[in-house]
C-alpha cells in the first residue's frame, strides 16, 4: 500500500503491515512485479486538516490522530539519482499527481480555504512536488509508461507525453499487464 494523506506515516515508514500480498511501504520504494519496475511515493495535502485536528483534540483523547503534519509528499533528488543508477522505472504509483493532471479544478477548495487559508498554497506545493518527480524521471530518461494515483476520489485517464496517467476513484482498480509477452 502507498501512503495516503489520511494514513499514519509510521505505518509506512516502519512497514508495520507485512502480509504476503498486502504491505505498507515507505516512500521511494521500488516494487518489481510482472516485469515492471514500479516507483511508489505517497502523501498529499488534507484539505480537511483543520477539521481533523479539532476532531482529534475533542474525540481522540488517547492521542490517536487522523491528521499528521508530515502528510505531504516530498521530493528527494538524492534517492531519485540513486534509483537511476540502479534501475529503470517504467511505472509510478503516487497518492497525488503532477499539476498538469486532473483534478485541476479548485472549485471544491473554497469552503475549506475559509477555515484554513494556507490550503491553496499547500495544494500548489503538493502538486509542484509531483512535477519535480516527473521532470526528474523524464530528465533521467526513465521509460515511464504508466502513472497511477488516487487522492481526488474520481476517475480519469489520459496519455500525456507518452505516459498513461490514471486517476483512480475509491475502490477502482487497474490492471498493469505484464511487460513480458510470454507471461
Regions found by a protein language model. Name each.
Residues 34-128:
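Active-site-proximal loop/helix segment associated with metal-binding centers of metalloenzymes
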Residues 2-4, 41, 168:
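Generic beta-sheet signal
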Residues 2-13, 31, 46-51, 98-103, ...:
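Active-site environment of divalent metal-dependent phosphoester hydrolases
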Residues 14-17, 53-55, 106-109, 161-164:
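Short, glycine/charged-enriched secondary-structure capping and boundary segments
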Residues 1-33, 111-119, 123-129, 139:
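Core catalytic region of metal-dependent phosphoesterases/phosphodiesterases
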Amino acid at each position: 500500500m502507498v501512503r495516503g494523506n489520511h494514513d499514519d506515516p509510521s505505518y509506512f515508514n516502519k512497514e508495520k503491515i507485512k502480509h504476503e500480498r498486502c504491505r505498507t511501504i515507505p516512500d521511494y520504494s521500488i516494487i518489481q512485479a510482472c516485469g515492471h519496475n514500479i516507483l511508489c511515493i505517497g502523501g498529499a495535502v488534507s484539505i480537511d486538516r483543520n477539521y481533523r485536528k479539532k476532531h482529534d483534540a475533542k474525540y481522540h483523547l488517547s492521542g490517536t490522530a487522523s491528521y499528521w503534519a508530515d502528510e505531504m509528499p516530498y521530493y528527494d533528488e538524492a534517492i531519485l539519482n540513486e534509483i537511476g543508477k540502479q534501475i529503470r522505472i517504467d511505472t509510478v504509483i503516487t497518492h497525488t499527481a503532477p499539476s498538469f493532471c486532473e483534478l485541476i479544478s479548485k472549485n471544491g477548495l473554497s469552503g475549506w480555504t475559509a477555515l484554513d487559508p494556507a490550503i491553496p498554497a499547500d495544494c500548489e506545493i503538493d502538486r509542484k512536488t509531483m512535477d519535480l518527480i516527473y521532470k526528474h524521471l523524464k530528465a533521467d530518461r526513465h521509460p515511464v509508461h504508466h502513472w497511477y494515483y488516487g487522492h481526488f476520489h474520481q476517475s480519469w485517464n489520459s496519455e500525456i507525453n507518452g505516459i498513461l496517467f490514471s486517476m483512480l476513484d475509491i475502490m477502482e482498480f487497474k490492471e498493469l499487464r505484464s511487460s513480458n509477452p510470454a507471461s
